[in-house]
């Protein structure tokens, strides 16, 4: 399955559970570990867990191998590793504190869900 298709499925899974501030970053020029990073926010620990679970279920149903996931216990920051696509789901305070978008080069997101797209989508 193409990276863009995996990303699209992950974003749809996040939207299904009302994830907020969903962005996709193209990390292909920054690391060889993965091609895309998707970041989303959940309003509560329970929603963060549900968002991550939704991503895992949707990707598995499409035949995508899940390499691993972490953070389900606390529900503050859950990571889902689908190989070339990595999904981070966080509480708002955790996302603000770690600001991983800035850590990955301070780049503009390649895709912001639900927002005007002043730059081209991947």
From Swiss-Prot:
Pfam families reported in the protein's UniProt record: RsfS
MF GO annotations: ribosomal large subunit binding
GO CC, alphabetical: cytoplasm
Top-level taxon of the source organism: Bacteria
Location of this chain's protein in the cell: Cytoplasm
GO biological process: cytosolic ribosome assembly; negative regulation of ribosome biogenesis; negative regulation of translation
Keyword set, alphabetical order: Cytoplasm, Repressor, Translation regulation
Role, per record: Functions as a ribosomal silencing factor. Interacts with ribosomal protein uL14 (rplN), blocking formation of intersubunit bridge B8. Prevents association of the 30S and 50S ribosomal subunits and the formation of functional ribosomes, thus repressing translation.
HAMAP family according to UniProt: Iojap_RsfS
Family per similarity comment: Belongs to the Iojap/RsfS family.
Subunit structure: Interacts with ribosomal protein uL14 (rplN).
Protein's UniProt name: Ribosomal silencing factor RsfS
Organism the protein comes from: Chromobacterium violaceum (strain ATCC 12472 / DSM 30191 / JCM 1249 / CCUG 213 / NBRC 12614 / NCIMB 9131 / NCTC 9757 / MK)
Gene: rsfS
């Amino acid at each position: 399955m193409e990276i863009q298709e995996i990303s699209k499925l992950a974003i749809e899974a996040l939207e299904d559970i009302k994830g907020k501030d969903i962005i996709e970053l193209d990390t292909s020029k920054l690391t060889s570990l993965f091609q895309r990073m998707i970041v989303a926010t959940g309003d509560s620990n329970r929603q963060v867990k549900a968002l991550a679970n939704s991503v895992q279920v949707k990707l598995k149903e499409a035949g995508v191998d899940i390499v691993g996931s972490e953070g389900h216990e606390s529900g503050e920051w859950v990571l889902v590793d689908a190989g070339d696509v990595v999904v981070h789901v966080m509480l708002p305070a955790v996302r603000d504190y770690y600001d991983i978008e800035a850590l990955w080069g301070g780049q503009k997101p390649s895709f912001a869900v639900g927002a005007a797209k002043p730059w081209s989508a991947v």
